[in-house]
């Protein structure tokens, strides 16, 4: 039975090497199409990226993405990076994310050596007006939607299925517990 297990594990290792080359190349092309400046990356799985005209995205060295249930069992939405027309996304060096979503409608800044767990959602916008009259009138504009920048420091760990809301600053070395909702800033720690 052991030879079968070893053969299976060897096939899986070969598959992961081939898949990494394929998905990294695919992601580089998607980044290029969207104008994302990225020094170096490694990807496993298909990330969905959309940088609107006028939006900017810059990613440092050593960016690592795992997305899709074939490559990570945590989180189920896949990796999504969405930057609005006036949005700015800045990601530092050695940042890893698994099946996480980042929406930068105004500004999201992520420092160096940050780990973003599966299912994490980082939103700098409410997406819609919180005023029910405006929201239901059919006249809602981008100016009616509340937005505020998010800043995540260096060496931060964001646990699985956490939500980081608009206006939050997370200090260097902080740990965000799995399943938490951050609506207020978190000190260094």
Where are the regions that the model predicts?
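Short beta-to-alpha loop/turn elements within the nucleotide-binding domains of ABC transporters
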Residues: 120, 168, 180
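A generic "structured core" feature
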Residues: 157, 171-175, 180-181
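Short, compositionally biased segments
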Residues: 181-182, 189
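Domain-scale signature associated with acetyltransferase and cell-envelope carbohydrate enzymes
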Residues: 1-123, 127-129, 146, 150-155, ...
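Short glycine/proline- and charge-enriched loop/turn segments
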Residues: 132-142
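Conserved coupling/switch loop of ABC ATPases
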Residues: 166, 184
């Amino acid at each position: 039975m052991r030879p079968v297990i070893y053969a299976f594990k060897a096939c899986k290792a070969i598959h992961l090497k081939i898949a990494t080359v394929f998905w990294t190349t695919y992601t580089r092309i998607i980044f290029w199409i969207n104008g994302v400046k990225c020094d170096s990356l490694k990807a496993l799985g298909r990330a969905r990226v959309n940088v609107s005209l006028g939006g900017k995205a810059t990613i440092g060295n050593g960016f690592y993405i795992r997305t899709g249930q074939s490559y990570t069992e945590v989180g189920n939405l896949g990796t999504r990076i969405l930057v609005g027309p006036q949005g700015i996304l800045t990601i530092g060096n050695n940042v890893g994310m698994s099946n996480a979503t980042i929406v930068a409608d105004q500004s999201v800044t992520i420092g160096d050596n940050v780990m973003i767990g599966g299912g994490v959602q980082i939103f700098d916008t409410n997406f819609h007006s919180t005023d029910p009259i405006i929201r239901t009138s059919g006249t809602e504009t981008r100016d009616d939607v509340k937005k505020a920048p998010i800043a995540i420091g260096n060496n931060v760990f964001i646990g699985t299925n956490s939500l980081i809301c608009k206006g939050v600053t997370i200090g260097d070395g902080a740990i965000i517990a799995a399943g938490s909702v951050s609506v207020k800033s978190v000190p260094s720690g």
